[in-house]
Amino acid sequence: SESKKVFLDAGVPTPQAEILDCSNGIVMPSLPLPFVIKPPCEGSSVGVHIVRRQEDVLPAMKEAVTHGTTVLVEEFIQGKELTVGILDGKALPVIHICPRSGFYDLSNKYPWMNMGGGTDYICPADLPEETAAKVQEAALKAYKAAGVEVYGRVDVLLREEDGAPFVLEINTIPGMTPSSLLPKAAAASGWPYEDLCEKIVELSL
């Protein structure tokens, strides 16, 4: 929720949102449907619900407050899920995240946990050069607005109807296993895994 405020203040393109304080009981969202309900302090899409029908709002809110009393409600944008790794203030190639079913939730991120889902990653993303540059520009703007240094990863939605990029969130400590997304993007840019790790350590000193 703090990053959302930072994005809005800095003019970073990001979905419309409201932050609900449910410490004294559930507060119902005022955004028009469809929208996304998410606990702002969880990772890996835990507790995230895409809500399309009015009757599903209350159950989703009840589930969200089990993760904390602050709930982020965000306009739902139909489009491609992308992520941009950033190293030393420079954007790496865009990755297209392609869940095999539904959206990029826990089961699609970590299919071995429940033997379901799964996701394909296309890097560099299958985008026109101009579109990829727009996505990288939005990601860099978010990275700088949040005051991140050395490295990070920014999740972006590319709206289906007009190809406009919208920043969802920034990961200031992205996964760094050889199969994680930032190393995938770095490899596509010519950075072997060992060199990437050395560069991050060097920049951090």
Specify the residue positions occupied by each region the protein language model found.
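Phosphate-binding site of ATP-dependent enzymes
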Residues: R52-E137, P165-F166
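Glycine-rich phosphate/pyrophosphate-binding beta-alpha loops
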Residues: S45, R100-F103, N171-A185
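Short beta-strand-to-turn element immediately C-terminal to the catalytic PLP-Schiff-base lysine
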Residues: L20, V48-R53, I86-D88, R159, ...
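Conserved metal-phosphate-binding beta-hairpin within the catalytic cores
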Residues: E75, I86, Y143-M176, A186
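Amphipathic alpha-helical segments that line or abut small-molecule/effector binding pockets
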Residues: A133-L140, E194-E202
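Active-site nucleotide/adenylate-binding loops and adjacent lid/helix of ATP-dependent enzymes
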Residues: S1-K80
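Peripheral (often C-terminal) accessory segments that flank ATP-dependent C-N-forming ligase machineries
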Residues: D120-A125, A145, E149, R159-E161, ...
